[in-house]
C-alpha cells in the first residue's frame, strides 16, 4: 500500500467518522432545552440493554470473516454467506429477547407506546449483520468510501430526524432513540446493495451441522471479550433499572457519563495514530521505546482529563441549556477520569494480540466488567445512583492491578515497563490529578487559562525531555 493510500485511508477511517460527534456537540444547545433527565434515563436504560445484546448477537462469528478472506480468496463469499445467515438468525432471537426485557423494564410497560418503543430500540440488534460484514469487507478490499460515507450518511440522517422530533415535535426520548433506528435501517438497506450484490454475499443455509458446531466452537470464546466492554459502560444503568431507581436519576448519570466520555477521545485517537510505532517497538523488542510511548499516551490522558474537568462547568454553560441536565456536571467531572487508564489497556493488550494469546484479554475487559456489575448490584441499593459513579471508576482503574495478580501480565508488563512499582506511581498521579481538578473546577476563568497553559507547558516539557519526537 502506498504512503498516499495509507494517509487517505487513515483520513477516511479516523477523521470522517468524527464529524458525527462534532455535529452532535453543535446540536446540544438546540436540543437540551427540550429534553429532561427522564428522557435521558429512558434512553440510557434502553441503549444499555440494546448494547448488551448487540455485543452478544454476532456470537463471535466475525472471527471467520478475515481468516476466510485470506485462506479462501476465491470462495470466501461462501463462508461469509453462512456467517451472514447465522448472524441474521441470532440477531432476530436476541432482538426479540431484548424487546421482552425492555417491556418489563421501561416505565411504559405493556402498552402500544411501550411495544413500539421496544421495537424501535431493538432494531440495531435485528439489523446489525450487514453493518458488521461491511466493517470487515471494505477495509480488506481497500475501499473505505462505501463504508465510511454510508455510515456517515446514516448517522447524519438519524441526527436530523432526532433534531426534528426533539426540537419541533417535542417528543423527548423518542427523538433520542429514533436516531439509532434511522441510521441502522439506512445502513442495512444500502449494504444490501454494496455487500450482498456487489460481492455476491447472500445468506446461505449450512446443512453441515458439524461445520456449524466447529465454527461456533472457535467463535463463542470471543463473546466475553466483547461483552466486557458493554458491562463496563452499561452495567450501572441496567442494575439501576432493575432496582427501580428513578429514571430522572438514571438520566443524570447517563448524561454525565456521556459528557465525561469525551475525555478519552484524544487518548484513543493518539493511541490509534501511534499503533504502527507501538507494534513495531514491541515486535523489535525495543522495550525502551515501547515504555516511552506508553508514558506519552498516559501523560496526554492525564492532561486531557485534567483540562476537560476544570473546564466542564464552562462546557455545560455553553452547550447544555437545561437546568435539570446541568446537575450532571459534577458527575461528568468525576467520570472523565474513569477511562484515564485507557493507555494502560492499549499497551497491555498489544502483546496479547501480537502473540495471539487472546484468551488473556478476558482479564483486561471481562473481569473489570463483571466487577462493575457486582459493585453496582451491591452498592446501588445502599447508596443510590451515585454509587454507580464510583463503581465505574473503580472497575476501570482495576486494570492497573492486573499485572500484580495475573502471571502473563506480570511477566509482560515487567518486560516493557521495567518495574511494576511504576504502576503505583501512575495510580497516585491519577488520584491526585482527579482530586486537584475537581477542587479547581470552580475557580475564575483567568485562573483556568493559567492552569491550562501550565498543564500544556508541562506536557510539552515532558515530550521534549524524553525526546519522544524521535519515536513518532
Label each region the model flagged.
Residues 1-6, 145, 173, 177, ...:
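Interhelical loop/hinge segments that connect adjacent transmembrane helices in multipass membrane
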Residues 5-62, 91, 95, 99, ...:
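Signature of the first transmembrane helix
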Residues 119, 148-197, 367-371, 385-407, ...:
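Hydrophobic alpha-helical transmembrane segments
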Residues 68-71, 127-150, 174, 336-367, ...:
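Membrane-interface junctions at transmembrane-helix termini in multi-pass inner-membrane proteins
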Residues 27-28, 57-74, 256, 260-284, ...:
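Helix-loop junctions and terminal segments of transmembrane helices
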Residues 368-371, 417-472:
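Transmembrane alpha-helical segments of multi-pass transport proteins
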Residues 9-24, 154, 179-191, 195, ...:
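Transmembrane helical elements of multi-pass membrane transporters/channels
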Residues 84-109, 189, 267, 291-342, ...:
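Alpha-helical transmembrane segments of multi-pass membrane transport and lipid-handling proteins
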Amino acid at each position: 500500500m502506498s504512503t498516499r493510500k495509507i494517509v487517505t485511508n487513515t483520513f477516511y477511517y479516523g477523521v470522517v467518522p468524527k464529524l458525527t460527534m462534532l455535529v452532535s456537540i453543535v446540536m446540544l444547545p438546540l436540543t437540551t432545552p427540550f429534553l429532561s433527565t427522564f428522557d435521558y434515563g429512558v434512553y440510557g436504560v434502553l441503549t444499555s440493554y440494546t448494547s448488551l445484546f448487540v455485543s452478544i448477537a454476532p456470537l463471535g462469528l466475525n472471527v471467520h470473516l478475515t481468516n476466510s478472506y485470506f485462506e479462501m480468496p476465491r470462495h470466501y463469499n461462501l463462508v461469509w454467506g453462512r456467517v451472514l445467515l447465522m448472524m441474521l438468525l441470532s440477531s432476530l432471537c436476541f432482538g426479540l429477547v431484548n424487546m421482552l426485557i425492555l417491556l418489563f423494564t421501561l416505565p411504559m410497560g405493556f402498552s402500544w407506546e411501550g411495544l413500539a418503543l421496544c421495537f424501535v430500540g431493538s432494531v440495531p440488534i435485528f439489523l446489525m449483520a450487514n453493518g458488521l460484514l461491511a466493517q470487515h469487507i471494505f477495509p480488506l478490499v481497500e475501499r473505505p468510501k462505501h463504508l465510511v460515507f454510508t455510515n456517515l450518511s446514516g448517522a447524519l440522517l438519524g441526527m436530523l430526524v432526532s433534531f426534528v422530533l426533539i426540537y419541533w415535535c417535542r417528543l423527548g426520548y423518542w427523538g433520542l432513540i429514533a436516531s439509532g433506528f434511522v441510521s441502522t435501517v439506512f445502513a442495512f438497506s444500502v449494504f444490501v446493495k454494496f455487500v450482498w450484490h456487489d460481492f455476491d454475499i447472500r445468506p446461505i443455509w449450512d446443512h453441515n451441522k458439524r461445520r456449524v458446531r466447529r465454527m461456533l466452537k472457535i467463535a463463542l470464546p470471543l463473546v466475553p471479550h466483547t461483552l466486557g466492554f458493554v458491562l463496563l459502560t452499561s452495567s450501572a444503568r441496567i442494575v439501576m433499572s432493575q432496582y427501580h431507581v428513578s429514571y430522572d436519576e438514571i438520566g443524570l448519570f447517563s448524561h454525565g457519563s456521556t459528557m465525561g466520555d469525551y475525555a478519552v477521545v484524544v487518548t484513543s485517537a493518539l493511541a490509534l495514530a501511534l499503533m504502527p510505532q507501538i507494534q513495531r517497538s514491541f515486535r523489535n523488542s525495543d522495550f525502551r521505546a515501547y515504555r516511552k510511548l506508553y508514558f506519552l499516551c498516559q501523560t496526554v490522558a492525564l492532561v486531557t482529563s485534567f483540562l476537560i474537568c476544570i473546564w466542564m462547568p464552562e462546557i455545560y454553560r455553553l452547550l447544555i441549556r437545561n437546568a435539570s441536565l446541568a446537575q450532571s456536571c459534577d458527575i461528568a467531572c468525576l467520570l472523565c477520569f474513569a477511562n484515564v487508564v485507557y493507555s494502560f489497556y492499549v499497551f497491555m493488550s498489544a502483546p496479547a494480540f501480537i502473540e495471539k494469546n487472546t484468551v488473556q484479554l478476558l482479564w483486561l475487559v471481562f473481569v473489570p466488567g463483571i466487577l462493575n456489575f457486582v459493585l453496582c448490584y451491591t452498592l446501588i441499593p445502599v447508596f443510590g445512583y451515585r454509587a454507580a459513579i464510583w463503581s465505574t471508576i473503580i472497575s476501570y482503574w482495576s486494570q492497573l492491578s492486573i499485572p500484580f495478580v495475573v502471571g502473563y501480565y506480570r511477566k509482560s508488563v515487567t518486560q516493557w515497563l521495567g518495574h511494576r512499582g511504576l504502576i503505583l506511581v501512575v495510580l497516585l498521579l491519577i488520584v491526585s490529578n482527579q482530586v486537584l481538578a475537581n477542587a479547581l473546577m470552580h475557580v475564575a476563568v483567568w485562573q483556568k487559562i493559567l492552569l491550562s497553559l501550565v498543564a500544556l507547558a508541562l506536557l510539552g516539557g515532558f515530550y521534549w525531555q524524553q525526546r519522544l519526537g524521535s519515536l513518532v
